Amino acid sequence: MAHPTQLGFQDAASPVMEELLHFHDHALMIVFLISALVLYVIITTVSTKLTNMYILDSQEIEIVWTVLPALILILIALPSLRILYLMDEINDPHLTIKAMGHQWYWSYEYTDYENLSFDSYMIPTQDLTPGQFRLLETDHRMVVPMESPIRILVSAEDVLHSWALPAMGVKMDAVPGRLNQTAFIASRPGVFYGQCSEICGANHSFMPIVVEAVPLSHFENWSTLMLKDA
């Protein structure tokens, strides 16, 4: 969960998000080193009178400023491509959930069950209980078993939406008439918050996403109760 004055990302709750955090640190280190090098060159150039200001040609300098950026781009591209393919992998999902965006709420359908679906609306501020988060709580949470591959099918009923869950490293556009898919594995139990991340109208800010990751036995009990109430 994000908190005031936070500078970094949320704590990772999935293997993909852990990889994204590592890549962020890797890229940030490269940017920091480049910035330090440029700053050093500027300072030394300005502060010394020994710099030759009339160089018209230097084969060595041209080789360095061509090869070095190419190597740096390769150092950034290789781990980036690895994570890109990792995010697209969906191997043998244990559970498939269809998330449908509406103006302005989400509906969820557990496609492995005959009749397990519900709408998820934001809880108004005046109805919140102590300890709940304003604009982030919903009347029905999407409950998933932890340490299990979960496939999410994302679409929309009316306009463009986007199903985003930062702690899981997931963001997938919901497009009317199109079925997109993504996946995640919750590596620990907890309640994780997200929001619609595509401007979709007047109440765009009021369609939160709440995912609760629980042990498999708790998920089975929850699904049994939901099927009885259906």
UniProtKB/Swiss-Prot annotation:
It catalyses: 4 Fe(II)-[cytochrome c] + O2 + 8 H(+)(in) = 4 Fe(III)-[cytochrome c] + 2 H2O + 4 H(+)(out). It comes from the Eukaryota. Keywords: Copper, Electron transport, Magnesium, Membrane, Metal-binding, Mitochondrion, Mitochondrion inner membrane, Respiratory chain, Translocase, Transmembrane, Transmembrane helix, Transport. The chain crosses the membrane at residues 15-45, 60-87. CDD domains: CcO_II_C. Its cofactor is Cu cation. The keyword Hydrolase does not apply. InterPro entries: CcO_II, CcO_II-like_C, CcO_II_C, Copper_CuA, Cupredoxin, Cyt_c_oxidase_su2, Cyt_c_oxidase_su2_TM_dom, Cyt_c_oxidase_su2_TM_sf. Mg(2+) binds at E198. It is a multi-pass membrane protein. Cu cation A1 binds at H161, C196, C200, M207. Binds a dinuclear copper A center per subunit. Cu cation A2 binds at C196, E198, C200, H204. GO terms for biological process: ATP synthesis coupled electron transport. One of its GO terms (molecular function) is cytochrome-c oxidase activity. Its EC number is 7.1.1.9. PROSITE patterns: COX2 (PS00078), COX2_CUA (PS50857), COX2_TM (PS50999). Belongs to the cytochrome c oxidase subunit 2 family. This is Cytochrome c oxidase subunit 2. It comes from Formosania lacustris (Oriental stream loach).
